[in-house]
Amino acid sequence: MALDKTKVAYQIYPKSYKDTTGNGIGDFRGIIEKIPYLAELGVDMVWLNPFYPSPQRDNGYDISDYTAVNPVFGDMADFEEMVRVAKEHKIDFMLDMVLNHCSTEHEWFQKALAGDKYYQDFFFIQDQPTDWLSKFGGSAWAPFGDTGKYYLHLFDETQADLNWRNPNVCKELFKVVNFWRDKGVKGFRFDVINLIGKDEVLVDCPENEGKPAYTDKPIVHDYLRMMNEATFGSDDSFMTVGEMSSTTIDNCVLYSVPERHELSMAFNFHHLKVDYEDGQKWTIAPFDFEELKRLYHTWGKEMSERGGWSALFWNNHDQPRALNRFVDIKNFRNEGATMLAASIHLSRGTPYIYMGEEIGMIDPDYDSMADYVDVESINAYQMLLDQGKSPEQAFKIIQAKSRDNSRTPMQWDASENAGFSTGTPWLKAGKSYKDINVENEIDGPIFKFYKELIRLRKEMPIISEGSYQPALEDSQQVYAFERHLDGQKLLVLNNFYGSEAEVEIPAEYQSGRVLLSNYDDAELAEKVSLKPYQTLAILVK
């Protein structure tokens, strides 16, 4: 698996990208219409969130048919045309594969419920539940029909965990992966894939809600190698990424080193918990810069030294917009957006851009709970009230942390609904769309900066291939790192604050050249005063 490390991925939440039918929901034809825009940006791979038939209890991550298209997005002919048109623009597609669990409406589960022993072995069905908790709250077990038994669901009770110990399950799932490969797909993102390694007998695990009993178990590596061999492993141009829940560096190295033939890279989320108070999501706290820096340095250095590979990202469909979390957007939206971009695009790993990030989209700033549709947010609001928070306090927390923040319609222009739909959008457009939209921003500093970062990664092996080394570790407001390759060195300085930062430039870099900055007048000296949210990359031959 010789991963092309010059590639950059772009994530599309299909429901919110572009609606061509007026039903308020984005569709494949909307994506086809915008492929020239993606080509202008310069991305190589588009990751699509699930578009399969689904009861939509978990935004399509509860799949009832793995080899069909939910008609709300179009049909298979539309999908095939989308893949073909994208290839003409040198863009490939990466699909979301949800193989830890399927919907209880899937025919496998329905046949199991009807008493078919063959399909009952596809799931974890026990006489007694364990003490494990679901990641969505409550027990991870639900009654299996009226049999008196229970089935395992680590997520919603309509998402039944699949038993990978059963070779028939593996055979069916590998058939699914190959079905989409045959459609021309060139990448897969495997949802919570490090949870597929359950033990033969499931027992109580009081520690940490039961997570140690099913997270990063050694057998996961065996399953991934089996899948690699049976599906995408023979194609060197394939890109695979595992979403890893509550994972460790040691495991991510194993998942991603090429010689193990598992996956190309791993997603981890530790850096997006640095604004959680006491580890709790539903809180408001300033981000912990020291912790952010420590995480980036630890993961960057370890993955570099041990040959692992990471997916790098600030935003996705489950997170509020990074600009709202890390930047003073009232005063420095452009500078903050470009600094955040440089801090990962110049680092070691494959960068992922989440739709709208390239134009500096921000959270929607909704006025009331009635604007939110995400079930997690609605439940959290009630939980916060139950904990004694006032409606105002609870709403402020939802405003800051809701997953709907990133799921609002893509902002194309200043017309009604941000140019996303002529109908009523499934989720209201953010308030900022009249100012922040593609039409306004395509010639603006953020979009241009993203294009430049993508170009540099393609042209400069030190960015795509170089090692990672922490730099200026004592700085209280600058996250800095070095990249090294074949005698070349690159120093990247990122000021994470809206105030200036004095930096002593290491001697060997003082005679280097400024490769990139998000301010025009960047000059080198022994001491440099970085402006608010400035990024400065210095190259030494």
Task: Give, region by region, the residue ranges found by the protein language model.
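Loop/helix patches that line or flank the sugar-binding groove of alpha-linked glycan CAZymes
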Residues: 2-5, 222-224, 231-237, 254-256, ...
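Beta-strand-rich binding/interaction modules
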Residues: 500-518
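C-terminal beta-strand-rich structural cap/linker in extracellular carbohydrate-active enzymes
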Residues: 525-541
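Acidic/aromatic-lined carbohydrate-recognition and catalytic surfaces
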Residues: 2-178, 182, 195-248, 257-258, ...
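Hydrophobic residues within beta-strands of alpha/beta enzymes
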Residues: 46, 188-190
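Active-site rim elements
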Residues: 160-166, 170, 213-214, 322-335, ...
